[in-house]
Every structure is written in C-alpha cells, then in structure tokens.
C-alpha cells in the first residue's frame, strides 16, 4: 500500500471544506427561519450548567473513539499509548470534516505510520474499527427495536411506516460489510467477482490494489478476532459511545421541557435516526443526520420543537466536536514532532 494513502489535509482543501461547511450551515439555518423565534426561546431556557452537560456528553463521543483506536492498535503495537489513541480519534474527526467525508482514514493512517505502524496493517485496523462501529449500531438498534417494537408500531404514522424497510436495507449492507471482513467464504467470493473487471490497464491496477487491501483486511481480521477479550472491550466501548450520543436528544428535550418521551423511547428513536442516516447521502457528516432526525422525531414533536432539539443536538455532537478536534489535531501534530517512531512489536 502506497504512502499516498496516508496524508494530512492540505491548507487549500481545508479552507475549501470550511467554506462548504459554512455554506451548508447557512442553508440549514435558512430552512429553520420560520421557526427561529421558537428555537431561540427554547435555547434561552437553558442554564449554563445544562449547556455544559450537553456539550460534555457530545465531547465524550470522539474521546471514546480514541479509546477504541487505542485498544485496537495495541493488538499490533503493544506500546501504543492512550494519548496516542486519543490523537487518532481527533485526527479522524478533523479529517472527516475538512476533507468533506473522504479523508478520515488517510489522516489517521498518516499518524499511525509516524508512530510505527505500517500502512497495510494500519488500514486494516482502521477498517475493522469502522466495521465494529457499524456492527454495534446494528446491534443497538436491533435490541431497541425488539424491546420496544409494540410501542413504536402503535405510535408511527406516515413515512415512519417505511422505517422497517429502511432498517432492512441498511442491515443487509452492514452484514455484508462484516462478512467481507470476517468470512473467508465471502472474501473468496469477492476475489472471484473482481476477476470479472474489464481487462484494461486501469481496471487491472484497481483490481490489484483491491486484492491487496482484501488480503490485508483478511490477515488483520483473523489476528484481531482471535483475541476475544479485546473484541469484547471494543464492543463495550462502542456501545458506551453510542449510549452517550443517544442520550443527547433526551437531555435536550428534558432541559427544554418539550416532550413526555421516556428515556428508552428516545434511545430507540435516536438509534433508528442514526441507522436511517447511513442510507442517506451526506457532505462532511452533514445533511443525512438532519434529514433523518426530522423524519424520526417529527412524528413525536411539533415542528418548532424538533428543530430546537436538532439545533442543540448538532451544536453538541458536531460543531463543538469539530472545533475540539481542530485543537486535538494540531496537538497530535506536536506530539508527532516530539517523538521518534518506535519499531513494530
């Protein structure tokens, strides 16, 4: 795997991405203009401590992602520290936004390569981290659905009735991704299918690259999945990360005094919201979440209320997190400048 796969975002691309982010934010604010009075009134009710509590829960997400990276990378680099894991988490969050969703893994690979992890294993481990995340999202939403399916069926109308269909489509995609990582049978099937690519130089080069990535992924998945205690730790951290994220809308609703929805009901709705957002297009993590949030929570809150909750939710889970990741990213660069890369263990 070439070192081109691991890179830092350039200043030019970062500036363009920030302008796109600003434009998207302006579009979202414009769509909220008819309910701006309700939104500002709801936000004005919040105390300083309530705002700080919501922001703290939002910041916990990238911190726990860093903990997951720490646990995963230590399977290859036993000397990999928690601080370095947090650096990887910040690099992923920052890279995902400033490259409009395309650069989280390359930025993480750049950091991991600098601390001594070869690019191939690094790419395999970061892909497996993504697979663990998607698997946990699927399991979390499935458990919530099984426990509260009767309540959801009795309280959904309109487009929400299509939610099971969307769930099934996304579930199939996630299961296929998991099987590609862990099943030798599916990996062999993928190799066979790649043989049908056009016999041109361009496509054959792509085929060679994909086969190399598939081989690395197969090797790293066997190594990681053989360590059952480590896998359980990863799943536990992923579940805790999602639990905190799914608590955010409940805190927003409660602090604003907007709805009688119960804690576990909001957990269900938020897990489904995140699940549905995976099937929607997004730019730098924006667009899909907002659409899915309005779709899911719009059946349980008034229009102005759901927009108020969405506004605070995105401030805590996206904008403040991105601002923190910018600081974390530059601190990570300082850490790299202060160390010599260790040898692989």
Range-by-range predicted roles:
Residues 1-41, 92-204, 282, 286-345:
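Transmembrane helix-loop-helix hairpins in multi-pass inner-membrane proteins
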Residues 51-55, 82, 86, 123, ...:
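Hydrophobic alpha-helical transmembrane segments
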Residues 10-11, 47-49, 78-87, 117-119, ...:
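Membrane-helix interface segments
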Residues 13-16, 45-53, 222-236:
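Membrane-interface helix starts
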Residues 29, 40, 69, 73-77, ...:
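Membrane-water interface at transmembrane helix exits
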Residues 221-272, 280:
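Transmembrane helical segments that form the transport core of multi-pass membrane transport proteins
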Residues 37-45, 213-226:
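A short amphipathic helical element positioned immediately N-terminal to and/or at the very start
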Residues 64-94, 252-269:
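Membrane-embedded helical hairpins/re-entrant loop segments and their flanking transmembrane helices
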């Amino acid at each position: 795997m070439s070192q081109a796969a691991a890179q830092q975002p350039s200043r030019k691309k970062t500036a363009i991405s920030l302008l796109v982010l600003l434009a998207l934010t302006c579009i979202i604010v414009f769509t909220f203009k008819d309910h701006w009075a309700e939104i500002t009134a709801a936000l004005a009710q919040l105390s300083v401590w309530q705002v700080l509590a919501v922001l703290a829960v939002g910041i916990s997400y990238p911190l726990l992602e860093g903990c997951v990276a720490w646990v995963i990378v230590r399977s290859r680099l036993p000397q990999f520290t928690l601080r370095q894991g947090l650096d990887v988490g910040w690099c992923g969050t920052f890279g995902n936004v400033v490259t409009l969703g395309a650069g989280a893994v390359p930025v993480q690979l750049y950091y991991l390569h600098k601390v001594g992890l070869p690019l191939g294993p690094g790419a395999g481990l970061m892909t497996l981290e993504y697979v663990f995340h998607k698997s946990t999202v699927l399991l979390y939403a499935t458990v919530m659905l099984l426990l509260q399916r009767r309540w959801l069926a009795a309280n959904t109308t309109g487009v929400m009735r299509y939610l099971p269909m969307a769930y099934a489509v996304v579930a199939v995609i996630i299961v296929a991704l998991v099987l590609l990582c862990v099943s030798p049978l599916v990996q062999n099937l993928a190799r066979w299918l790649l043989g049908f690519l056009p016999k041109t130089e361009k496509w054959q080069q792509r085929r060679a690259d994909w086969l190399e990535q598939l081989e690395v992924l197969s090797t790293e998945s066997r190594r990681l999945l053989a360590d059952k205690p480590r896998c359980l730790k990863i799943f536990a951290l992923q579940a805790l990360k999602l639990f905190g994220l799914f608590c955010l809308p409940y805190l927003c609703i409660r602090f604003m005094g907007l709805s009688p929805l119960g804690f576990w009901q909001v957990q269900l709705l938020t897990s489904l919201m995140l699940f549905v957002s995976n099937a929607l297009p997004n730019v730098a993590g924006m667009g899909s979440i907002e659409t899915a949030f309005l779709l899911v929570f719009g059946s349980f809150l008034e229009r102005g209320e759901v927009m108020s909750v969405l506004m605070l939710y995105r401030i805590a889970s996206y904008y403040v997190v991105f601002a923190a990741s910018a600081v974390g990213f530059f601190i990570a660069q300082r850490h790299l400048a202060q160390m010599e890369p260790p040898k692989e263990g």
